[in-house]
Amino acid sequence: MRTRRLPLVLAMLAALPVVAAQESTTGPVAPAISVVHCGHLFDSETGRMLGETSITVAGDRIKAVRPGAPEAGVKVIELGNATCLPGLIDSHVHLTMQTSPTQYSDQFRWNISDYAIRSTVYAQRTLMAGFTTVRNVADMANESIALRNAINAGIVPGPRIFSSGKAIGSTGGHADPTDGYRMDLAGDPNPSGGIINSPDDAWKAVRQHYKDGADLIKIMPSGGVLDESASVDNAQMTIEEIKAVVAAAHDYGFTVAAHAHGAEAIRRAVIGGVDSIEHGTFMNDEDMKLMKEHGTWLVPTIIAGKYVGEMAEKPGYYPAQVAAKAKMVGPIIQGTAGNAYRAGVKIAFGTDAAVYPHGQNAKEFQYMVEAGMPTAFVLQTATTHAAQLLKHEKDFGSVTAGKFADIIAVPGDPLADITLMMKVEFVMKAGVVYKRDSMTVEPLTQSAPTPSKAQGDELKGY
């Protein structure tokens, strides 16, 4: 990666919203008022399936939701007998990268522009899969912040993004991008680059993230699977460092997500006050009890664990040390998620997209059901629960008057067959129709809308 060019490239990417202000966007938008008519509606607030429903959309918001057919004389988006659901939320993605057998060498051949351009493709695949909002938890050089800005400006299609920017962790830990590489090639990251080794460093790192335009903070208090270090589960941050990150983050209104596989790292993160545990592979009964007491969310990412376990069996796909760790995590993570559900831990949907190919996010629903979670509950994890984790339950997470018009549709009853969530045929985000397979929808030809205040810079997409 040509790091000398990085400041210039990032400056260019960050300027995208300014460019957008000088251009006339041409993307499709919903008319001033239209009605989405579907055979069934999943009520994510109650977990019940409702019958025939008409959803009135005014601009980017839902104006009314009523049973039955639409009134005469209104513009109708007719979805027949399809089931409508709220736009889905994936609480753990990495839109600026994707798994590949060359991923470890690519970072020395590609510059940050290569990753940023590819991210626009991954974002569109995610939106087409029905995910209208995502939490992007870690990138390499804040390129997901530039992607968020470009989507908000109407330059490229994609989900509403809440971005952490770079992750924060310790020297030699899972967040250290130089781990396993020569210092003269990779350098020695400091707090401005997300690497900390004291509470004072933590404050500087969080403040830098605020300056960079992040929407939340992601920390790495445990080892991980895909880095080239030896351990997947060792604790890599002290409680004092975690508490400092959380205190600084809360000063800026940020939530804190913690990547943690190991039991001790999970314990420290929960005591330190984080909002969510990502993965939680080796959590024990004490961890689950602590999480329930503290109200800490679990974002399970079962699909990622299964995928790395499968790829680890392919010779050469991962470095040997990575493959060994993947084989440890793969068989365990699904059972842990089921145990956490039965222990009463709060669960929000998240997949670790990029660890597996983008656009396959909905496979996680099937894996959660297989882990013993009720189907309605599983759908709620990607709607009301995830919205609560993001602290934006007033804006999205259910098909309710006043919220963003984020609506998707599948061809049948997902409560009876959860695999239908992998067959999304209709996607509307903030009143704009992006996908309409096999549906009767009038062409929409107006230019892209200016986001309302709750969707714009204050939300920052994440």
Residue ranges and their predicted role:
Residues 99-102, 144, 173-174, 227-229, ...:
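Histidine/acidic-residue-rich catalytic or RNA/ligand-binding cores of hydrolases
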Residues 97-115, 124, 171-190, 225-239, ...:
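Active-site gating loops and adjacent loop-to-helix segments of metal-dependent hydrolytic enzymes
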Residues 149-167, 232-258, 295, 299-303:
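Alpha-helix-loop-beta-strand connector modules within alpha/beta enzyme cores
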Residues 107, 251-255, 320-321, 327-413:
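His/Asp/Glu-enriched, well-ordered alpha-helical/loop segment
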Residues 118-143, 157-167, 214-227, 255, ...:
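Divalent metal-dependent hydrolysis catalytic cores, especially in the metallo-beta-lactamase
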Residues 24-27, 41-54, 67, 374-379, ...:
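Acidic, glycine-enriched loop/beta-strand segments at the rims
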Residues 82-155, 171-178, 240, 264, ...:
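Metal-associated gating/positioning segment near the N- to mid-region
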Residues 27-32, 41, 46-85:
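Histidine-rich, glycine-flanked metal-binding segment
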